[in-house]
Structures are given as structure tokens and as C-alpha cells.
């Protein structure tokens, strides 16, 4: 029970800032503990990797088109030579619309955040301001202990 009740400093910082940059020990396990703490406080959580995310504004908040792998099959006729486009729901926008009534909000936890560009980091800083029910946590690298700082400070330094 002590693992669930601790972590209030992290939760306060996340609610105050909206977006945090996290540094966790490389052996892992810490993100699961803090996600469990967030869920116990009433937040829903989504975990994605920042690699291959594409355009964050489109992939996270809008319906967007993707081209599935063609697996050696050619398109014939009126479709483009590169393949058909399939439209998928937004990764964050759709779950955000369908949050349970008793949920405080939605936490987007991104792994491998060191691959994000400064423009993408600044987008993640402004995202919780545009949608107050959304909180963003981005793992930026490793550290000896679990630490965090506002994502705005990391985006300015990048």
C-alpha cells in the first residue's frame, strides 16, 4: 500500500506543470510504479514510444491517414502506386473523449523522448494548455534515481 500512497510530489508537479520530463534509472520498473500511482489517483494512462510517432499533432489529436505495408502486392486501377490510405482514430483524442466520468484526466507517457525534436517538445508543452484534462510525461533519458523537471525547461534548453 505504501507504493500507491507515495509519489504525491510527482503528482503535484504533473498537475501544476501539465508536462514533465522524466529521468529514470535504466534498469526500468520506475515508470510502472509511477503509472500505478497515477491510476490510483484517478487518472487513465496511455504509454507509447516516441519513435515512429510521426507528426504528433496529427497522430495524437486528429483522424489521420496511414499506408499499411503492401506485403508485395501491387495496387491496380485508380489507387496511387504507393498504396491505399486507411484512416485511423487519434491516439489520444479518441480516448480523451471517452474518459470515464470519474476519471481526473488522461496521462500520455512517452518512452524514448530523447529522439524528439525541439519543435515536437514545444508542442508537448502546449498540449496540456490546449486540453486541460491531458497530462504529458516524457522519458528523456537515464539517471541514478527517478527525477523530473518541467518539460518547458527541457524544451528551452534543446
UniProtKB/Swiss-Prot annotation:
Q: Which controlled-vocabulary keywords does the entry list?
A: Membrane, NAD, NADP, Plastoquinone, Quinone, Thylakoid, Translocase, Transport
**Membrane topology, from the record:** Peripheral membrane protein
What's the domain of life for this entry? Bacteria
Answer yes or no on keyword Iron-sulfur.
no
User: What GO cellular-component annotations does this UniProt entry give?
Assistant: plasma membrane-derived thylakoid membrane
A single MF term (Gene Ontology): quinone binding
Which Pfam families does the protein's record reference? Answer: NdhN
Q: List the InterPro entries.
A: NAD(P)H-quinone_OxRdtase_su_N
Known catalysed reaction(s)? Answer: a plastoquinone + NADH + (n+1) H(+)(in) = a plastoquinol + NAD(+) + n H(+)(out); a plastoquinone + NADPH + (n+1) H(+)(in) = a plastoquinol + NADP(+) + n H(+)(out)
Tell me, what does this protein do in biology? Answer: NDH-1 shuttles electrons from an unknown electron donor, via FMN and iron-sulfur (Fe-S) centers, to quinones in the respiratory and/or the photosynthetic chain. The immediate electron acceptor for the enzyme in this species is believed to be plastoquinone. Couples the redox reaction to proton translocation, and thus conserves the redox energy in a proton gradient. Cyanobacterial NDH-1 also plays a role in inorganic carbon-concentration.
How would you summarize the oligomeric state and partners of this protein? NDH-1 can be composed of about 15 different subunits; different subcomplexes with different compositions have been identified which probably have different functions.
PANTHER family in the cross-refs? NAD(P)H-QUINONE OXIDOREDUCTASE SUBUNIT N, CHLOROPLASTIC
Q: What is this protein called?
A: NAD(P)H-quinone oxidoreductase subunit N
